[in-house]
Amino acid sequence: EEKAQFLILHPPYDDIIKFSDKKEDLSNCSSTDEFYDLFAKVAKNGYDMLEKGRFAALIIGDSYKNSEVQPLGFECMARMMALGFKLKGIIVKDIQGNERAKGKTANLWRYRALAGGFFIFKHEYVMIFQKN
């Protein structure tokens, strides 16, 4: 049986952006707890497919819901560690300016944040794990 040499997980950030109408899509979860549960299943599939000793990367940010930060990155990190992944490093990636690269303006996101009562995050995490 062939195994993967490297695993990259870059899940949607809870329900911030809907990517499809499929019920299996993590962006369509009805709650943050459901998102965490389904993410854990995806991570388990990846763990099983990854060759022993190889690495995985989780790229994720946080969300803001009900007037508080939802620490998606750290919650998903904990689920990966519970599967047996060993955390090797955390990189905090500056994402300021990404909206301009996508043809959007920073003012649009600032307006949406003020109108919608949410916080604009300017970072995301790149977490590196190893399967032992």
Residue locations for each model-derived region?
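Class I S-adenosyl-L-methionine-dependent methyltransferase catalytic core
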Residues: 1-132
